[in-house]
């Protein structure tokens, strides 16, 4: 049961990171949109937080 919850948490956090960074959304970029580096830094931060939470739950 613990492994199933870990897998469910991992999948949901990865989907959340993809939605947040716009990987799954099909939005067209305009000239006034922020650069890709700012978008990637937000995704990198969310990935780090998700990874830390996953390890805390898995090793507890």
Swiss-Prot record:
Membrane topology: Lipid-anchor; GPI-anchor
Lineage: Eukaryota, Metazoa, Chordata, Craniata, Vertebrata
Gene Ontology BP annotations: positive regulation of cytosolic calcium ion concentration
Protein function: May play a role in carrying and orienting carbohydrate, as well as having a more specific role.
Organism of origin: Macaca fascicularis
Name of the gene: CD52
InterPro entries per UniProt: CAMPATH-1
Name of this chain's protein: CAMPATH-1 antigen
Keyword Membrane attached: yes
Localization per Swiss-Prot or TrEMBL: Cell membrane
Residues linked to a lipid group, GPI-anchor amidated serine type: 35
Propiece span(s): 36-60
Glycosylated residues (UniProt): 27, 39
Keyword annotations from UniProtKB, A to Z: Cell membrane, Glycoprotein, GPI-anchor, Lipoprotein, Membrane, Signal
GO CC field: plasma membrane; side of membrane; sperm midpiece
Predominant cellular place of this UniProt entry's protein: membrane
Pfam families, sorted: CD52 (PF15116)
Signal peptide start and end residues: 1-24
């Amino acid at each position: 049961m613990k492994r199933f919850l870990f897998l469910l948490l991992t999948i949901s956090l990865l989907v959340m990171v993809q939605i947040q960074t716009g990987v799954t959304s099909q939005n067209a970029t305009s000239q006034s949109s922020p650069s890709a580096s700012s978008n990637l830094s937000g995704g990198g931060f969310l990935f780090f937080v998700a990874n830390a939470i996953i390890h805390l739950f898995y090793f507890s």
